[in-house]
Amino acid sequence: MSTYLIGDIQGCDSALDRLLQHIDFSPSRDTLYLLGDLINRGPASADVLRRCMEYGDAVKPLLGNHDLHLLASAHGVRKPGRRDTLQSILDAPDRQDLLKWVAQQPLARCLENPQGQQLLMVHAGVLPQWSLKDVMALAQEVHDHIRSEGLPEFLQHMYGNTPNQWHATLTGHDRLRVIVNALTRIRFCTPGGAMDFESAESAEAAPVGLVPWFECPDRQTRDVMVAFGHWSTLGLINRPNLMALDTGCVWGGCLSAMEIGHDFTERQLHQVHCDQAQQPG
Protein backbone atom coordinates (compact mmCIF):
# COMPACT_ATOMS: atom_id res chain seq x y z
CA MET A 1 0.00 0.00 0.00
CA SER A 2 1.43 3.36 -1.08
CA THR A 3 0.38 6.95 -0.42
CA TYR A 4 0.98 9.71 -2.95
CA LEU A 5 0.52 13.48 -2.92
CA ILE A 6 -0.12 14.89 -6.40
CA GLY A 7 0.17 18.52 -7.48
CA ASP A 8 -2.06 20.58 -9.77
CA ILE A 9 -3.53 18.47 -12.60
CA GLN A 10 -5.61 21.26 -14.17
CA GLY A 11 -7.51 19.11 -16.62
CA CYS A 12 -4.48 17.26 -18.00
CA ASP A 13 -5.98 13.79 -17.90
CA SER A 14 -3.46 12.18 -20.25
CA ALA A 15 -0.61 13.29 -17.98
CA LEU A 16 -2.47 11.95 -14.95
CA ASP A 17 -3.02 8.64 -16.72
CA ARG A 18 0.68 8.35 -17.56
CA LEU A 19 1.68 9.25 -14.01
CA LEU A 20 -0.62 6.61 -12.55
CA GLN A 21 0.76 4.03 -14.94
CA HIS A 22 4.29 5.10 -13.98
CA ILE A 23 3.64 4.49 -10.27
CA ASP A 24 1.60 1.34 -10.96
CA PHE A 25 -1.35 2.83 -9.10
CA SER A 26 -4.00 0.42 -7.85
CA PRO A 27 -7.17 1.88 -6.29
CA SER A 28 -7.59 -1.27 -4.22
CA ARG A 29 -4.15 -0.82 -2.68
CA ASP A 30 -2.97 2.81 -2.91
CA THR A 31 -4.22 6.26 -1.91
CA LEU A 32 -3.91 9.51 -3.86
CA TYR A 33 -4.13 12.90 -2.17
CA LEU A 34 -4.75 15.59 -4.79
CA LEU A 35 -3.70 19.09 -3.75
CA GLY A 36 -6.41 21.02 -5.60
CA ASP A 37 -6.92 22.52 -9.06
CA LEU A 38 -7.90 19.21 -10.53
CA ILE A 39 -9.45 21.04 -13.47
CA ASN A 40 -9.32 24.04 -15.82
CA ARG A 41 -6.81 25.31 -18.38
CA GLY A 42 -6.06 21.77 -19.58
CA PRO A 43 -7.97 19.94 -22.33
CA ALA A 44 -9.85 17.22 -20.40
CA SER A 45 -11.29 18.54 -17.16
CA ALA A 46 -14.39 16.33 -17.20
CA ASP A 47 -12.26 13.24 -17.79
CA VAL A 48 -10.10 14.06 -14.76
CA LEU A 49 -13.18 14.26 -12.54
CA ARG A 50 -14.65 11.04 -13.92
CA ARG A 51 -11.37 9.23 -13.36
CA CYS A 52 -11.20 10.43 -9.77
CA MET A 53 -14.80 9.46 -9.11
CA GLU A 54 -14.19 6.02 -10.60
CA TYR A 55 -11.38 5.38 -8.12
CA GLY A 56 -13.70 6.03 -5.17
CA ASP A 57 -12.16 6.31 -1.72
CA ALA A 58 -8.66 5.75 -3.13
CA VAL A 59 -8.70 9.40 -4.27
CA LYS A 60 -8.88 12.13 -1.65
CA PRO A 61 -8.87 15.60 -3.27
CA LEU A 62 -9.12 19.05 -1.82
CA LEU A 63 -10.42 22.17 -3.49
CA GLY A 64 -8.31 24.79 -5.22
CA ASN A 65 -9.25 28.13 -6.74
CA HIS A 66 -10.05 26.61 -10.14
CA ASP A 67 -12.33 24.01 -8.58
CA LEU A 68 -14.23 26.74 -6.75
CA HIS A 69 -14.37 28.74 -9.98
CA LEU A 70 -16.11 25.78 -11.61
CA LEU A 71 -18.82 25.86 -8.95
CA ALA A 72 -19.25 29.61 -9.44
CA SER A 73 -19.52 29.18 -13.21
CA ALA A 74 -22.02 26.35 -12.84
CA HIS A 75 -24.23 28.49 -10.60
CA GLY A 76 -24.12 31.49 -12.94
CA VAL A 77 -22.06 33.62 -10.57
CA ARG A 78 -19.14 33.87 -13.01
CA LYS A 79 -18.94 33.33 -16.75
CA PRO A 80 -16.06 31.10 -17.86
CA GLY A 81 -13.13 33.25 -18.93
CA ARG A 82 -11.18 33.27 -22.16
CA ARG A 83 -8.65 30.76 -20.88
CA ASP A 84 -11.05 28.54 -18.97
CA THR A 85 -11.69 25.01 -20.21
CA LEU A 86 -14.70 24.16 -18.08
CA GLN A 87 -17.22 23.61 -20.85
CA SER A 88 -16.63 19.86 -20.99
CA ILE A 89 -18.02 19.75 -17.45
CA LEU A 90 -20.74 22.37 -17.83
CA ASP A 91 -22.11 20.67 -20.97
CA ALA A 92 -21.63 17.10 -19.76
CA PRO A 93 -24.59 14.71 -19.54
CA ASP A 94 -23.34 13.79 -16.06
CA ARG A 95 -22.83 17.45 -15.11
CA GLN A 96 -24.80 17.22 -11.87
CA ASP A 97 -22.87 14.18 -10.67
CA LEU A 98 -19.55 15.90 -11.43
CA LEU A 99 -20.54 19.13 -9.68
CA LYS A 100 -21.93 17.30 -6.66
CA TRP A 101 -18.69 15.36 -6.29
CA VAL A 102 -16.58 18.53 -6.48
CA ALA A 103 -18.74 20.30 -3.89
CA GLN A 104 -18.26 17.43 -1.44
CA GLN A 105 -14.49 17.90 -1.25
CA PRO A 106 -12.79 19.78 1.63
CA LEU A 107 -10.36 22.70 1.51
CA ALA A 108 -7.83 21.07 3.84
CA ARG A 109 -6.84 17.60 4.93
CA CYS A 110 -4.61 16.35 7.71
CA LEU A 111 -2.86 13.01 8.05
CA GLU A 112 -1.38 11.70 11.28
CA ASN A 113 1.02 8.78 11.41
CA PRO A 114 1.51 6.30 14.28
CA GLN A 115 4.35 8.45 15.65
CA GLY A 116 1.98 11.40 16.03
CA GLN A 117 3.50 13.42 13.19
CA GLN A 118 0.96 15.49 11.29
CA LEU A 119 0.86 16.38 7.62
CA LEU A 120 -1.35 19.30 6.60
CA MET A 121 -2.48 19.53 2.99
CA VAL A 122 -3.92 22.71 1.45
CA HIS A 123 -4.04 24.04 -2.08
CA ALA A 124 -2.20 27.36 -1.69
CA GLY A 125 -1.15 28.08 1.87
CA VAL A 126 -2.09 29.23 5.35
CA LEU A 127 -1.87 32.48 7.27
CA PRO A 128 0.81 32.86 9.95
CA GLN A 129 -1.70 33.40 12.75
CA TRP A 130 -3.37 30.04 12.20
CA SER A 131 -2.49 26.89 14.09
CA LEU A 132 -3.19 23.49 12.56
CA LYS A 133 -6.36 23.32 14.62
CA ASP A 134 -7.39 26.74 13.29
CA VAL A 135 -6.77 25.72 9.68
CA MET A 136 -8.93 22.63 9.94
CA ALA A 137 -11.74 24.46 11.74
CA LEU A 138 -11.76 27.40 9.31
CA ALA A 139 -11.63 25.10 6.28
CA GLN A 140 -14.62 23.28 7.73
CA GLU A 141 -16.52 26.58 8.02
CA VAL A 142 -16.18 27.11 4.28
CA HIS A 143 -16.88 23.46 3.53
CA ASP A 144 -20.16 23.68 5.45
CA HIS A 145 -21.28 26.62 3.31
CA ILE A 146 -20.32 24.87 0.08
CA ARG A 147 -22.41 21.85 1.03
CA SER A 148 -25.40 23.91 2.14
CA GLU A 149 -28.37 25.40 0.34
CA GLY A 150 -26.61 28.73 0.74
CA LEU A 151 -23.92 27.78 -1.80
CA PRO A 152 -25.09 30.27 -4.49
CA GLU A 153 -24.97 33.18 -2.03
CA PHE A 154 -21.56 32.08 -0.77
CA LEU A 155 -20.23 31.96 -4.34
CA GLN A 156 -21.60 35.43 -5.14
CA HIS A 157 -19.52 36.90 -2.31
CA MET A 158 -16.46 34.64 -2.62
CA TYR A 159 -14.52 36.77 -5.10
CA GLY A 160 -12.45 39.77 -4.07
CA ASN A 161 -9.14 40.72 -2.48
CA THR A 162 -10.42 42.41 0.65
CA PRO A 163 -10.09 42.08 3.54
CA ASN A 164 -6.56 40.84 2.92
CA GLN A 165 -5.69 40.06 6.52
CA TRP A 166 -7.12 37.78 9.15
CA HIS A 167 -8.84 39.02 12.27
CA ALA A 168 -10.65 36.62 14.57
CA THR A 169 -13.48 39.16 14.82
CA LEU A 170 -14.29 38.90 11.10
CA THR A 171 -17.79 37.65 10.38
CA GLY A 172 -20.02 36.80 7.45
CA HIS A 173 -18.82 36.97 3.87
CA ASP A 174 -15.63 38.87 4.74
CA ARG A 175 -14.57 36.08 7.07
CA LEU A 176 -15.26 33.36 4.51
CA ARG A 177 -13.49 35.31 1.75
CA VAL A 178 -10.29 35.65 3.79
CA ILE A 179 -10.32 31.93 4.56
CA VAL A 180 -10.86 30.99 0.90
CA ASN A 181 -8.19 33.40 -0.32
CA ALA A 182 -5.62 32.06 2.12
CA LEU A 183 -6.30 28.39 1.47
CA THR A 184 -6.66 28.64 -2.32
CA ARG A 185 -4.90 31.81 -3.58
CA ILE A 186 -2.10 33.03 -1.32
CA ARG A 187 1.51 33.19 -2.49
CA PHE A 188 3.09 36.27 -0.95
CA CYS A 189 2.14 38.18 2.17
CA THR A 190 3.71 40.60 4.61
CA PRO A 191 5.52 39.07 7.59
CA GLY A 192 2.38 39.90 9.57
CA GLY A 193 0.11 38.04 7.16
CA ALA A 194 -1.43 40.72 4.91
CA MET A 195 -1.99 38.87 1.63
CA ASP A 196 -0.82 40.13 -1.76
CA PHE A 197 -2.61 38.98 -4.92
CA GLU A 198 -0.64 40.90 -7.54
CA SER A 199 2.55 38.86 -7.84
CA ALA A 200 2.78 35.26 -9.03
CA GLU A 201 6.53 35.22 -9.54
CA SER A 202 9.07 32.88 -7.97
CA ALA A 203 10.01 33.23 -4.32
CA GLU A 204 13.29 34.87 -5.33
CA ALA A 205 11.33 37.68 -7.01
CA ALA A 206 9.34 38.60 -3.91
CA PRO A 207 8.17 42.23 -4.05
CA VAL A 208 9.61 44.59 -1.46
CA GLY A 209 8.03 44.06 1.93
CA LEU A 210 6.58 40.66 1.04
CA VAL A 211 7.66 37.09 1.75
CA PRO A 212 6.38 33.71 0.62
CA TRP A 213 3.65 32.75 3.08
CA PHE A 214 5.70 29.83 4.38
CA GLU A 215 8.61 32.14 5.29
CA CYS A 216 6.61 34.23 7.77
CA PRO A 217 8.77 34.25 10.90
CA ASP A 218 5.92 33.71 13.36
CA ARG A 219 3.95 31.15 11.35
CA GLN A 220 2.06 28.98 13.82
CA THR A 221 2.30 25.92 11.57
CA ARG A 222 6.08 26.08 11.18
CA ASP A 223 6.47 22.85 13.19
CA VAL A 224 3.82 21.07 11.11
CA MET A 225 4.61 19.39 7.82
CA VAL A 226 2.68 21.24 5.09
CA ALA A 227 2.09 20.14 1.48
CA PHE A 228 0.60 22.48 -1.12
CA GLY A 229 0.33 23.21 -4.84
CA HIS A 230 -0.92 26.33 -6.66
CA TRP A 231 2.43 28.09 -7.20
CA SER A 232 3.95 26.73 -10.41
CA THR A 233 6.65 29.41 -10.65
CA LEU A 234 7.90 28.35 -7.23
CA GLY A 235 8.83 24.94 -8.57
CA LEU A 236 9.32 21.77 -6.60
CA ILE A 237 10.16 22.13 -2.91
CA ASN A 238 10.95 19.10 -0.78
CA ARG A 239 12.02 20.17 2.70
CA PRO A 240 11.52 18.25 5.94
CA ASN A 241 8.47 20.36 6.85
CA LEU A 242 7.41 21.70 3.44
CA MET A 243 6.41 20.20 0.10
CA ALA A 244 5.42 22.30 -2.92
CA LEU A 245 4.16 20.09 -5.73
CA ASP A 246 2.74 22.32 -8.47
CA THR A 247 5.37 21.77 -11.16
CA GLY A 248 3.50 23.43 -14.02
CA CYS A 249 1.89 20.50 -15.79
CA VAL A 250 -0.55 22.65 -17.76
CA TRP A 251 2.29 24.97 -18.85
CA GLY A 252 4.40 22.14 -20.28
CA GLY A 253 6.23 21.25 -17.08
CA CYS A 254 5.76 18.07 -15.08
CA LEU A 255 3.00 16.41 -13.12
CA SER A 256 4.49 15.39 -9.79
CA ALA A 257 3.57 12.74 -7.24
CA MET A 258 5.40 12.51 -3.93
CA GLU A 259 5.25 9.05 -2.44
CA ILE A 260 5.41 9.25 1.34
CA GLY A 261 6.25 6.58 3.87
CA HIS A 262 4.71 6.00 7.28
CA ASP A 263 6.88 8.62 8.99
CA PHE A 264 6.29 11.21 6.20
CA THR A 265 10.03 11.85 5.84
CA GLU A 266 10.60 8.81 3.65
CA ARG A 267 9.75 10.24 0.25
CA GLN A 268 10.19 9.35 -3.38
CA LEU A 269 9.41 11.77 -6.19
CA HIS A 270 7.68 10.53 -9.34
CA GLN A 271 7.19 12.81 -12.36
CA VAL A 272 5.98 12.69 -15.94
CA HIS A 273 6.54 15.44 -18.48
CA CYS A 274 3.42 17.17 -19.79
CA ASP A 275 2.36 18.57 -23.12
CA GLN A 276 1.88 22.33 -22.94
CA ALA A 277 -1.84 23.09 -22.86
CA GLN A 278 -1.59 26.87 -22.46
CA GLN A 279 0.94 29.67 -22.60
CA PRO A 280 1.67 31.44 -19.30
CA GLY A 281 0.61 35.03 -18.99
Question: How does the language model describe each region?
Answer:
Residues 136-281:
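Acidic, His/Gly-rich catalytic cores of divalent-metal-dependent hydrolytic chemistry
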Residues 2-4, 57-60, 222-225:
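Short active-site oxyanion
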Residues 1-55, 68:
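N-terminal active-site segment of His-dependent metallophosphoesterases
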Residues 12-14, 40-42, 66-72, 129, ...:
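Active-site environment of divalent metal-dependent phosphoester hydrolases
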Residues 8, 37, 64-65, 102, ...:
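Divalent metal-coordination and catalytic microenvironments
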Residues 46-49, 53-174:
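Active-site neighborhood of divalent metal-dependent phosphoester bond hydrolases
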Residues 2-10, 119-125, 244-245:
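Active-site-proximal beta-strand elements of phosphoester/diester hydrolases
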Residues 5, 34, 61-62, 120, ...:
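Residue-level marker for buried hydrophobic side chains located in beta-strands
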